[in-house]
Amino acid sequence: MKKKLILGLVMMMALFSLAACGGGGNVVKTDSGDVTQDELYDAMKDKYGSEFVQQLTFEKILGDKYKVSDEDVDKKFKEYKSQYGDQFSAVLAQSGLTEKSFKSQLKYNLLVQKATEANADTSDKALKEYYKTWQPDITVSHILVADENKAKEVEQKLKDGAKFADLAKEYSTDTATKENGGQLAPFGSGKMDPAFEKAAYALKNKGDISAPVKTQYGYHIIQMDKPATKTTFDKDKKAVKEAYLASQLTTENMQKTLKKEYKDANVKVEDKDLKDAFKDFDGSASKDSSK
C-alpha cells in the first residue's frame, strides 16, 4: 500500500463528495473570513482534479468491459491483510482509510489488471518462449530477524536440532507468518525480494535450510517445504499462463492498455479546467513536447 496512493484516495473521496453536495456553504468560519465549500472544491480540483478524474473515468470505461466481483476484491483484500498481519488495521487508520474505501481502490487496480491481461499476447509461441525461463511455484517457511547476530544464533539452534516452526514462533518478527511456523504462501519467480527468491530456489529438497539471507526487511533463514517440479509445457501450461500474465502487469503495459481503452471509449472532457487531464492518453502530451 503506497502512501501516495492511499492519501490520494482519501483526497478523491473528499473532493467528489463536496462536488455532490454543492450549495456553496461554509466548511470553516473565522472572524477573519469563512472558507466555503466552493473555495475548498476549487482548490482541491486545481491540485488533484486531473489525477482523480482519470481514475473515475477509467473506472467507468473498464467497468463496462471487464468484471471484477466482490469475491475478487475480498480475496485481494485478504492477501493484503495477511501480508501486514497485526499491523494492517494500524496502517489503514494512519492513512485515513476504512476497509470499505481501501476495497474501492483495490477494485480499480483489479480492473486495470484485467484489462492489461486481456490485451496481452497469450499465444502458444509467447507462452513457450516464457516457459524457457519459467520456474514453478515453491512453498517455503522463513524466520525473519532484525540483525545478523540474531540470525546466526537461530541458525546455530537449528544445527543443534531445534525445530524450524518452533524457532519461527519464538524469534520471527514477521507477525503474519510466525504463528504458522513461518510458512509463506506459494510463490513463483519474480514475486519476492530478489535475494530471498534466489536463496529459496537454491534449496532443492524438502527440509533444506538456507544460511542467513539479507534483504531490505532484515535477515531471513529459509526452509524448503515444497520444491519446484517442472514437467512439460503441455502439463504446466495453465500455471505458465498465470505466471506469464502476472509478468505482463508492468507499469508500461498498463499504460499502453489504458491508452488503447481511452481511444476506444470516445472520451470528451467537457470541463475546461480539466482539459489536460488525459494528455498522457490522447497523444497531446507528445505533441506539446515536439513544439
Curated annotation (Swiss-Prot):
Lipid-acceptor residues (N-palmitoyl cysteine): 21
Membrane topology: Lipid-anchor
EC numbers: 5.2.1.8
Annotated Pfam families: Rotamase_3 (PF13616)
GO biological process, one term: protein folding
GO cellular component: plasma membrane
Keyword hit for Cell cycle: no
GO molecular function, one term: peptidyl-prolyl cis-trans isomerase activity
Endpoints of the signal sequence: 1-20
Entry superkingdom: Bacteria
UniProt KW keywords: Cell membrane, Isomerase, Lipoprotein, Membrane, Palmitate, Rotamase, Signal
Subcellular location: Cell membrane
Domain named PpiC: residues: 135-226
Disulfide pattern: none
SUPFAM superfamilies: FKBP-like (SSF54534), Triger factor/SurA peptide-binding domain-like (SSF109998)
UniProt keyword Transmembrane helix, yes or no: no
Family: Belongs to the PrsA family.
Name the UniProt record assigns to this protein: Foldase protein PrsA 2
